[in-house]
Amino acid sequence: MNISSALRQVVHDTRWHAKRKSYKVLFWREITPLAVPIFMENACVLLMGVLSTFLVSWLGKDAMAGVGLADSFNMVIMAFFAAIDLGTTVVVAFSLGKRDRRRARVATRQSLVIMTLFAVLLATLIHHFGEQIIDFVAGDATTEVKALALTYLELTVLSYPAAAITLIGSGALRGAGNTKIPLLINGSLNILNIIISGILIYGLFSWPGLGFVGAGLGLTISRYIGAVAILWVLAIGFNPALRISLKSYFKPLNFSIIWEVMGIGIPASVESVLFTSGRLLTQMFVAGMGTSVIAGNFIAFSIAALINLPGSALGSASTIITGRRLGVGQIAQAEIQLRHVFWLSTLGLTAIAWLTAPFAGVMASFYTQDPQVKHVVVILIWLNALFMPIWSASWVLPAGFKGARDARYAMWVSMLSMWGCRVVVGYVLGIMLGWGVVGVWMGMFADWAVRAVLFYWRMVTGRWLWKYHRSEPQKCEKKPAVSE
């Protein structure tokens, strides 16, 4: 009894206990309405990706390895689009926090136009140099795996313009506080992907299907359906703050807003592209370790992404919450809420990772029955659980910083940690010392550790708000009118 009383007293004396009611309000009124739909949307996307992997895995180990190699390059491009999407989200959230709907609409419209045109150019270049890209990415993979990876890449690059529209449109809606529409659209899109891809791969009734080609074609068709849905939602004004008519996309560009979006998006995109490029390089390390290791590595990343879903959702929510608070000048509130989201993510993810690690073999069996592949997956998932306590400091904190338009610091930290730790340490341990895929993943965890230390230091010192403080005096200046 004395022990329980002492414990209650310890809890009572903490700062958390004194502010527990305000934290409860924050959780239910601000974090939950944003994070839960984002979590459900991301869960739907990842689960549909898992089901897509199941569909391809039934075609054999080579097919799964081919998709994994092609997707490792596709992730570089998607990371770039997602970074510009982040810039749009922050500008929209900040503009609406200041009750400037017109600026939010113009930022959304111009981001969609510019990134769609860029995606078309990018798809053309990648389609032309596809063979050289796969040779670079696949390393010492077999000829059969390279051929399948090239086929999948050439089909999926056709979906880049649609992916850009869907990502940026969804990001703008989230910035406006509407997370349910992106959830509905992206959820439906991914269900369609499974249905269409399943039919195209394996056929229907007497039609035998297209086999492996159907996987890439189904994804491309589904993405274009999603892009049309996003443009339609914006055109009818489902969210009144972001009503954008189709004819408005042909209006002249406003470069002041473009630079505002790109001021966040470009550092974030440099960070994302360099990060995913480094990850692609580590994928090349794994590519020479055999088909079983390639497949096991691919499956382990898929499972780890599922485990990290709540943290990813909280990171996206922290960007929006921070942008909103700073948009109305509530600096102290933004700082308090970011800390709350960070600790919530850290404790939650650690618990999830440690509880799911004992079932790694069961989860791997949903993807494959190959014992060698399952063995690789089990080892990597246990390692992932061991280092999960530092994940949120590595990823949730910089997401919140970007809501304060502090994107450059995250860019430099990511460059340092990715190339100094993930690539170098991964190569030394995985290749030079012969640790294999475990050494490559240890390089990834070293990357997490460096990021965690530097981002946590920036949070506790308050330096992530310096850029915002410098921009505050400009609020009194009269801004030029923004034409739509």
Task: Describe the predicted segments one by one.
Residues 33-52, 155, 222-226, 230, ...:
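Transmembrane helical elements of multi-pass membrane transporters/channels
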Residues 38, 42, 53-54, 71, ...:
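Transmembrane alpha-helix boundary and packing residues in multipass membrane permease domains
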Residues 43-65, 134-143, 199-210, 269, ...:
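Helix-terminus/linker motif at the lipid-water interface of multi-pass membrane proteins
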Residues 61-72, 149, 153, 216, ...:
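Small-residue hotspots at the loop-to-helix junctions and early N-terminal turns
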Residues 85, 155-174, 182-190, 215-231, ...:
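Short runs within selected transmembrane alpha-helices of multi-pass transporters and secretion channels
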